[in-house]
Amino acid sequence: MTDFSSAFPNLRLRRLRKNPALRAMFSEVTVNANDLILPLFVKEGILEPKEIISMPGVFQHTLVSLVETVKTAVASGLKSVILFGIPEHKDPTGSMADNENGIVQQAVRALKKEFSSNELVVITDTCLDEFTSHGHCGILTTEGEVDNDLTLQRYVSAAVSQATAGADMIAPSGMMDGQIQAIRAGLDEAGFNEIPIMAYSAKYASALYGPFRDAAECAPEFGDRKSYQMQPSNVREARLETFLDIIEGADIVMVKPAVAYLDVIAELRQMCDLPIAAYHVSGEYSMVKAAGANGWIDGD
């Protein structure tokens, strides 16, 4: 290691921090609008946008307000959105998830009518929790457990339906074993071999998802999701989940929540060269907004 014991006063690191221009020039990491993905909620059967109480400034959108919101975002330099749909009809199998006239499919078509893929990347969440009457991310057995392999069939059908509607990218979030392999095979068989998959590889069970479940109206009717989402104490498991997603065909891997698992992001960067998405989740957002509203921090 280099000996810096006699570096001062010749070496003064504050020289490169003295003004905003210098700090920007030597920033090791830069986040721009085109690095971000905007999560948007679109709800069937409402006539005007509805603000989500636990997420100030975030709305359940109509198709019309969705398009207008995205127009504003694109004008600001944003290049990508991810869609979460809330249907009017929910049932045990989440039948509206793969319906060609489902709310997500309608939203995709509405956005593709306004924006080309060169202007906007439309990503669709591929899961069942927003669509099932019980709020779990899959098909339940008679014992109330999520049936992994039956659920995979529904994921494939939903992913193909979303791609058919015009989605540019599929994002399976349910944490079922083998979901990337199943969806990749299903998309390829349907002729969508060029559609990338963003895998929720290290998705930890977390109380920080609470406001999202308000927004997507998908809180579990009973139990929790700990049998399929990851245990917060596990890092080696995150490596294994990510490795499996990569060999199954993932194009992007993800860590969720992001802020509490920066060590996991760093760990995954050492093991793979794929893009890593960091999901800043609803609870993280809501904590900032709540602290800002109370004057404890600058919430902006």
Regions picked out by a protein language model, each given a short descriptive name:
Residues 2-7, 11, 19, 31-37, ...:
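Alpha/beta enzyme core
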